[in-house]
UniProtKB/Swiss-Prot annotation:
Domain of life: Bacteria
Protein name per its UniProtKB record: Uncharacterized protein YgeG
InterPro entries membership: T3SS_Ca_resp_chp_LcrH/SycD (IPR005415), T3SS_Ca_resp_chp_LcrH/SycD_sub (IPR016379), TPR-3 (IPR011716), TPR-like_helical_dom_sf (IPR011990)
Protein family according to the UniProt entry: Belongs to the LcrH/SycD chaperone family.
TM ranges: none
Key words of the record: Chaperone
Length: 163
């Protein structure tokens, strides 16, 4: 084994210890790799631009990168979910929306609404209904409530037609 290889292993152990220490304190990977908030904002701008232009495949690449390096950012999670959903990656989108909701400091019931849509796409109608009823029972935003109510009525009508 060359001295260069040994040096890499020594540095790797040191880096691993630094990583463990930083992560145990709740620091994100972006800071550990020198990705400043400004750099992350610029990457997010690219992702958002691709997303707005309908290029969800490229947007997904950037959102995934952002989530890896700044996982606690609810906007990154929500936007990553929003590109997974039209690609019919319903479970992944649902999980990302759920994480986004948990990281957001306020109740964003539009995220739960999207979670319900994902459950419909995944054919988990009971879970979708739970999402929509949660909105009806807890949300104060009439716009989101009316959309949830429309899904409840539609799903109830479909279950009566099929039952």
């Amino acid at each position: 084994m060359s001295t260069e290889t040994i040096e890499i292993f020594n540095n790797s152990d040191e880096w691993a210890n630094q990583l463990k220490h930083a992560l145990s304190k709740g620091e994100n990977l972006a800071l550990l790799h020198g990705l400043t908030p400004d750099i992350l904002d610029r990457i997010y701008a690219y992702a958002f631009d691709y997303h707005e232009k309908g290029n969800i495949t490229d947007a997904e690449i950037y959102y995934k990168f952002l989530c890896i390096y700044a996982f606690e950012n609810h906007e990154y999670l929500k936007d990553f979910a929003s590109v997974c959903q039209p690609k019919k990656k319903y479970q992944q989108a649902y999980d990302l929306y759920k994480l986004s909701y948990n990281y957001f400091p306020y109740d964003d019931y539009s995220v739960i609404y999207r979670m319900g849509q994902c459950q419909i796409g995944a054919k988990n109608i009971d879970n979708a209904m739970q999402c929509f009823y949660h909105i009806i029972n807890n949300c104060e935003d009439d716009s989101v409530k009316s959309k949830a109510q429309a899904y409840i009525e539609l799903l109830n009508d479909n279950s009566e037609d099929n039952g």
